[in-house]
Amino acid sequence: MDVEEKRVSSGYAKPPWIFKGSALYQIHLVKAATARAFIPKEFRLVEAFGYTLGGFFLASYDDSPAGVFDELVVIAGIVWNPPTSCAWAARVLVNSDEACHHGRKEVGLPSQVARFSKNITAVPKQKRDRAFGFLDTFGLGTTLSHPENLMEVKVSEVDSAASTDICNIQIRSDETKVGNWMGPAIKMALPSFSGNTIYNSNLLKYSCHLHCRVRPVRPAVVSGALEDETEKFTEQNHTSQESLENERQLSKAVMLSKPIIALQFKCLTMQVEAPVVIYPSK
């Protein structure tokens, strides 16, 4: 049976909403058991050999309906609701109250206010790493002649006056070696499901249309403390509503899973369409 949809009204100005800036899109192999903790029972997780494709989308917007802000979208995995498969966000962290409110109310996202602390340091020159011969094709291998910069992004979730560290993301760049090449200009769509939250109980579908320069880069290194009982949280969360801390731990598990590819988006213009209500196929 095809998915039935109806339009959702929006109070966040008039859609579509336009965001401009840059982003890192990193795809991970996420344990299916971890991803299922976030997926509504009405949807089916797309998985193989116990894993699904998740990861994160780390963006810095210099122009948006909410002004300048940073965003970390933790992607639990891919879900299937015929005739469409879409990404499902486990958590969305933003350093903008307005963006957080809009994400919760209008788009059905699990948005939380967060703090993003950024630090850039120079990395000593390194010898060429033969293991990255394939990456050298794209100008990504290390070399004696071109130093790298290391940007560290520390993300902390803010709840009233308290804050909780979520993760550190280390991103290496070697702009000198690749020169001004930012990759080809492309247009792509990233459809997503959302909703089923305390702020928006509907199941929703929305699309992000991206126009940007894209190139492959080294996967960012993600670090953070993870509780030993994450698997226990996973099992409990699969059958009942868990506490905020359990959800944080599972989101960390997604971030700390194995990366398989990373794409850098520059000169990014992202158009987000108004979400529509969907009804799970029988």
UniProtKB/Swiss-Prot annotation:
GO biological process: xanthophyll biosynthetic process
Phenotype of the disrupted gene, per the record: No visible phenotype under normal growth conditions, but mutant plants lack neoxanthin.
Top-rank taxon, per record: Eukaryota
InterPro entries in the cross-refs: ADC_dom_sf, NDX1-like
Free-text function comment from the UniProt entry: Required for neoxanthin biosynthesis. Probably not involved directly in the enzymatic conversion of violaxanthin to neoxanthin. Is necessary but not sufficient for neoxanthin synthesis.
Protein name: Protein NEOXANTHIN-DEFICIENT 1
Organism: Arabidopsis thaliana (Mouse-ear cress)
